[in-house]
Amino acid sequence: MTEFKDLAQMRRSHRKFTEQEIDADDVRLILRAALMSPTSKGQRAWQFVVVDDKQDIEKLADAKDLGSQFLKGAPLAIVVLGDPVQNDCWVEDGSIAAISMQYQAEDLGLGSCWIQMRGRGLSDGTSADTVIRGILDIPENLSVLCVLAIGHKADERKPQNEDKLKWENVHADKL
């Protein structure tokens, strides 16, 4: 197991993947990380849809105009949903779950990239939420936060450069 300090430095967004499928045990570990993530008041107001059907992945990639076409090359997509009525912190809780999955994927040697869907859409005014809702039969009580593209890395990215950390953005006691 990788030490977290190293994992945090190594995890980068990957947008190029090989065609190799992801092992079912690895998918389960990734989802386990999400299910174990902390939530506001222990509500666990999120849902996750695991998509490995190539046609559905391609449709998800077209749910917004910009920044999602690379999803078509991923063997796996995980759609993160939340229930805004059940918990007003659904965005935060879903975000914590999503990054937990990304760190777990990195620990398994897999690449991932967050694709923002909440508040995004098509140039005709159709929201990504509406498009994804139609593809995956999502009920009205749930809202789409993001889609994670996950796969075996087709490219290598350098770890975060320690010298470029913005320590000047950290303040003690007061800004």
Predicted features along the sequence, with ranges:
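Acidic, surface-exposed loops and disordered segments
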Residues: 1-175
